[in-house]
From Swiss-Prot:
One BP annotation, GO: response to nickel cation
Molecular function per GO: DNA binding; DNA-binding transcription factor activity; nickel cation binding
Job description of the protein: Transcriptional regulator.
InterPro entries on file: Acetolactate_synth/TF_NikR_C, ACT-like_dom_sf, Arc_rbn_hlx_hlx, CopG, CopG/NikR_regulator, Ni_resp_reg_NikR, Ribbon_hlx_hlx, TF_NikR_Ni-bd_C
Descriptive protein name: Putative nickel-responsive regulator
């Protein structure tokens, strides 16, 4: 982490009141930490848009394991990307439905492609990709 720099910001009074409410709701200790998090989030999202940055994400899937060949198809997709799918968690939600959470690491565009392939498998009831940073480039 580099040297800390102080700077001033001009902001509309109502916007500041709303921001202070957000700070309190989220539990930040001060405005500075909230602003740092907003800047980090914007930088991370920008890197995802480019698609060439190393990122990590979770792909969450909900599906009925009784659907013919669905579990096998999902497993095949994971093995097809064995170098990118670094971990998997399987949970039995009830007698029929399973939750699977996969941790995927790679270039942002690769992670998105893998998630789309998995979520698009016929029989998946719900799927979601949540991407985040590896943390290497953040300060």
């Amino acid at each position: 982490m580099g040297e800390t720099i102080r700077f001033g910001v001009s902001i509309d009074e109502k916007l500041l009141e709303s921001f202070d409410g957000l700070i309190e709701e989220k539990g930040y200790m001060n405005r500075s930490e909230a602003i740092r998090d907003l800047i980090r989030a914007a930088l991370v999202e920008l890197k995802w848009e480019v698609g060439d940055e190393e990122t990590v994400g979770t792909v969450t899937l909900v599906y009925d394991h009784h659907v013919r060949d669905l579990s096998d198809k999902l497993t095949e997709q994971q093995h097809a990307h064995h170098d990118k799918v670094i971990s998997a968690l399987h949970v039995h939600l009830d007698a029929h439905n399973c939750l699977e959470v996969l941790v995927v690491r790679g270039k942002a565009r690769e992670v998105k492609k893998i998630a789309d392939e998995l979520i698009g498998v016929k029989g998946v009831k719900h799927g979601k990709l949540v991407m985040t940073t590896t943390g290497e480039e953040l300060h």
